[in-house]
Amino acid sequence: MAGIDNKAAVMGEWFDCSTTNHRKRSKAELGREFSLNYIKNEDSLQTTFQESSRGALRERIAARSGFNAPWLNTEDILQSKSLTISSPGLSPATLLESPVFLSNPLLSPTTGKLSSVPSDKAKAELFDDITTSLAFQTISGSGLDPTNIALEPDDSQDYEERQLGGLGDSMACCAPADDGYNWRKYGQKLVKGSEYPRSYYKCTHPNCEAKKKVERSREGHIIEIIYTGDHIHSKPPPNRRSGIGSSGTGQDMQIDATEYEGFAGTNENIEWTSPVSAELEYGSHSGSMQVQNGTHQFGYGDAAADALYRDENEDDRTSHMSVSLTYDGEVEESESKRRKLEAYATETSGSTRASREPRVVVQTTSDIDILDDGYRWRKYGQKVVKGNPNPRSYYKCTANGCTVTKHVERASDDFKSVLTTYIGKHTHVVPAARNSSHVGAGSSGTLQGSLATQTHNHNVHYPMPHSRSEGLATANSSLFDFQSHLRHPTGFSVYIGQSELSDLSMPGLTIGQEKLTSLQAPDIGDPTGLMLQLAAQPKVEPVSPQQGLDLSASSLICREMLSRLRQI
C-alpha cells in the first residue's frame, strides 16, 4: 500500500487546484509540464514499486517452475536520458511500432531471414532517383530549424543549353552558306534570344520565286537555312556565281555581281574595236564604235568614255545595293532605302535589264539639250551624278510597250559637248509628225533615223545634230537626212542665234504662187543661243506660174518645218 500512497502523493504534485494558475497558463504549457513531470517521477515510482513487489513475484515464479530463479541485479543498468518527447500527442508506443526506426526481431515467415535496417548503399540508390538534389546539414541539439534545409540551384537547364550550344557549333559546319545559286538579301529581322538578326534572301534569277531564311546562333554561326519556293532554273556555272557567304566570322554578306550576256568571269573593263562598222555622218567627220563591257559607245574623245564609266558605276550601285554588313553593328542598309531601290528597279523593268541591253552614247556639240531624233520622249527625272557638275536628265519613250530610255548630260570639261545615252531597242517605227500625216507618208524615209532597224542590222545610225557654228542642219546632216543635190526654195531663210539654215532642202518643194521672204534673224543673238525669234508674218508675193507646183503641198511642208523648229 505504500506504493499506492506514494503514487497518490505524486498525483497531488501533478495537479494544482488553483484556478488562477490554469487561467494564466496555456494548454500547451500545461501539457508540456505534465509530460516532463511524468517522466521525472517515473524512475522513483518504479524503484519503490519494484522493491515492494520483488519478493512476492519471485516466490510465485519459484512455485510455478519448481526452482528458484536467480536474482537479477538491475541497479547497474543505466537508463538513457536522451529520449525526450516534446509533443504531448506522441507516445513511446508509436515509436516502437514504427517499421522505420526499429527492426523486427522475428524471422520472416516467407524467407526465414531477419529483416535488417536499410544500408547506406540502399539509401544512396534511393536518393539517386530524386531529380532535385538536397543539401543536408547537421541538426543542432536545440531542435529542428526549417531554414537548415536548402535547395541547391538547378544546373540542369544550363547544362542543356551548353549541350545545345555545342550542337549548334557542330551544325554550323553542316549548314553551307553557298548552295550554288545567286541570292540577294532583301531584309532582316531581330529574333528573340539571338544577337544576330534573321536574314532573308531571294534568288536573283528573273521570275524565280525561291527564297531562303538564314538563322544564326549566338556565336554568329549559321545553324539553319529554311528554303521556300522552288527554283525554275538550273544552277549557274561556277564562274558566274557571285554569292559570298561567310561562316564563322559573323559577317552576313551577299554580293551580286553584274552579269553580261556573252561574258563570263571578271568585271574588268575590256575594250576593243568592234568588227561591225558604224558610220556616223557628222559633216566631214566619222565616228568609231567601241564595245566596253557589252556596251556600244559612240564618241569623239574622253568625255563619252567618262560618261559611260559613270553610267556603269551608277548602274552597279543601283542594281547591287543589297550588300549588308551585320557584324559588330557595322553599316547596314535601311528598310526604306531598300524599298526605294526595289521600286526603282521595278519601274525600270528590272535592275539587270539596263546592264544587258545595248547602250549607245552619242556625243555632239550644241547649245541646246533637247535634240530631236524623231522619237517622242517624256522626261521623268534629273539628278547630278558623281564626277560631273552638270545635271543629267532622264527620258523614256512614250510609245506603248517600248522600254527604251535615254539620259542627256553635258560633258564635265566642255559645256557645249552634249552626251546622249540610248538604252535599249525601239520595238516600233518612228512616229509620224504631229501636225501632218502627209509628211509621214511621203517623206518618212527622210525624216527618221530608225534606231531599231539599224541596230538590228548592226549598222547603228543615230541622228547627229550639229553645232551652233555649223547650223542645226546641213546638206549632209542626219537630223533631217535631206538630199544634197536639192536646193532650198527661193526666198526661204531661217536664222537661229547667228547661224543661218541655208541648206534646208525639201524634195519637190517649189513654190508656185507665193514666196516666203521675211523670216529674219534677231539683231542681237542670245548669249545662250536658245532663243528663236520670228519676225512678222511671211509676206506673200506673186510669182510666175511656171516656177512651182501646187500651193497646198508647199504650205503643208512649210508648216511642218516651222513646227520642227519650234520644238527645237
From Swiss-Prot:
Domain of life per record: Eukaryota
Signal peptide (UniProt feature, chain positions): none
Subcellular location: Nucleus
GO biological process, one term: pollen germination
Segments of this protein annotated with the region Disordered: 230-252, 337-360
Keywords: DNA-binding, Metal-binding, Nucleus, Repeat, Transcription, Transcription regulation, Zinc
Binding site for Zn(2+): 203, 208, 231, 233, 397, 402, 426, 428
Annotation: DNA-binding region: 172-236, 366-431
Keyword Metal-binding annotated: yes
One Gene Ontology CC term in the entry: nucleus
Gene Ontology MF annotations: DNA-binding transcription factor activity; metal ion binding; transcription cis-regulatory region binding
Family: Belongs to the WRKY group I family.
The protein's role, per its UniProt record: Transcription factor. Interacts specifically with the W box (5'-(T)TGAC[CT]-3'), a frequently occurring elicitor-responsive cis-acting element.
UniProt protein name: Probable WRKY transcription factor 34
Natural source organism: Arabidopsis thaliana
Encoding gene, per UniProt annotation: WRKY34
